[in-house]
Amino acid sequence: DELSFDGETLRCVYGPRWRLIIIGAGQLSTYVAQMAKALDYHVIVCDPRAEYADTWDVPGTVLSREMPDDLVVALKLDAHSAVVAVTHDPKLDDLALLEALKSPSFYVGALGSRLNSQNRRERLLLFDLSESEINLLHGPVGLRIGSKTPPEIAVSILAEITAVRHGVELDTVGLVDGKEVSADASTSVCAV
């Protein structure tokens, strides 16, 4: 339970708090973290790379410099946890995803093109994950809203996390350049 008073509002939270673990502390992570804070997530950002971690400055978030897979294991993720990997570095993203997909997290996702996502799934099959565990991975991460800029991509990511959190069934058909298309390896969710 958490009790807080900011001089105007008395707030008491019962039960587990929703948390978002972001793998990577780059520009996109800043927007994702800020929006997640606005949605009242406890945000933990993990990046062992000094060039990113040293410049992290989002108030109200926790920064971890440990290896992402170690953090995911240490946090003992539960059904109120979401993990999103956005580094574009398989050495960081894949190891964290490997651990997150074995957890009861309600959402696990990774940034990347459809082709990169397909390649990631093939890499994960080489480890001790079942196909059903790998099918829990949301990738490319985010709803297909035509996002191009980091803030738009963050909106897309948090929209998908919110939909999954609320049990909304997501369609694999979306719009690209105003035309309805099916998801395949040649289309991407965002321009990253």
Give names to the regions the model predicted:
Residues D1-P48, Y52-S64, V73, D78-S81, ...:
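Segments forming oxygen-rich coordination pockets for charged ligands
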Residues G26-Q27, P90-K91, L115:
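Residue-level detector of alpha-helix initiation sites
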Residues A33-M35, D57-V58, L95-L98, R121-R123:
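Short amphipathic alpha-helical segments
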Residues M35-D40, E99-K102, L125-F127:
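Short, solvent-exposed amphipathic alpha-helical segments in soluble enzyme
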Residues L63-D70, L75, T87-K91, F127:
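A general structural motif
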Residues A74, D93-A96, G109-A110:
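Extended hydrophobic-aromatic, low-complexity segments
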Residues A82-T87, L98-R123:
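ADP-ribose/adenylate-binding Rossmann-like module
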Residues L111-V192:
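Adenosine-phosphate binding glycine-rich loop
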